[in-house]
């Protein structure tokens, strides 16, 4: 599921430790800090509690889209949420992730104003694979957001840094049709 470093640090699974009513007292916002809520055995109960709360739910971590099902998407669609973030860390997961993103879009009808997909670049991908993932996300009308692996050791002005600058500046990204077009500016 997660990369081995993240899995060793955070684990591969979430566990429900309490019902929402045990620590939530009607605030307008609920912020989820767990990217693996969908991996929890009690996911359905947790998602329904969040949906039924009426509060805005903030999925502020990159939710593992590989764990998305139609039922999970249907419940998430019923939540009051301003935004959800998914993670696409490895190009190798393309055949799993792309159908899941399409299914999520078909069920929720959410677009880039509500969906961001984190794209990890510079770990085990080529520039062509990075651009392909970004284009797939763009074609779905979701917002890609480039994160760089070991970014402090990537040279300033490098192709990866310029890719990150283009994609993460949403105004420029949606105005420039391609990375090549951006590079000519």
Regions from the language model: what does each represent?
Residues 109-110, 120-185:
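Auxiliary Fe-S-binding modules of radical SAM enzymes
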Residues 50, 101-108, 137:
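Hydrophobic positions in alpha-helices of CheY-like receiver
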Residues 1-100, 114-123, 143-147:
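Core AdoMet radical
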Residues 99-102, 131-132:
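Charged helix-capping and loop-helix junction motifs
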Residues 51-54, 80, 105, 167-171:
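Generic secondary-structure transition motif, activating predominantly at the C-termini of alpha-helices
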Residues 73-75, 102, 159-163:
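Short low-complexity, flexible loop/linker segments enriched in glycine and/or proline
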């Amino acid at each position: 599921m997660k990369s081995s470093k993240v899995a060793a640090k955070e684990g591969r699974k979430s566990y429900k430790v309490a019902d929402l009513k045990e620590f939530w007292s009607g605030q307008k916002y609920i912020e989820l800090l767990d990217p693996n809520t969908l991996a929890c055995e009690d996911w359905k109960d947790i998602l329904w509690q969040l949906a039924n709360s009426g509060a805005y739910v903030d999925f502020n971590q990159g939710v593992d889209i590989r764990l998305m099902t139609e039922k999970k998407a249907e419940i998430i669609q019923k939540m009051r949420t301003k935004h959800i973030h998914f993670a696409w860390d490895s190009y190798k997961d393309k055949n799993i992730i792309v159908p899941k993103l399409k299914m999520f879009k078909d069920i929720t009808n959410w677009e880039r104003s509500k969906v961001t997909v984190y794209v990890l670049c510079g770990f085990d991908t080529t520039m062509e694979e990075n651009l392909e993932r970004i284009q797939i996300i763009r074609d779905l009308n979701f917002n890609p957001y480039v994160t760089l692996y070991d970014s402090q050791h990537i040279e300033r002005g490098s192709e990866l840094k310029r890719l990150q600058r283009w994609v993460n500046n949403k105004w420029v990204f949606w105005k420039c049709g391609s990375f090549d077009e951006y590079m000519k500016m």
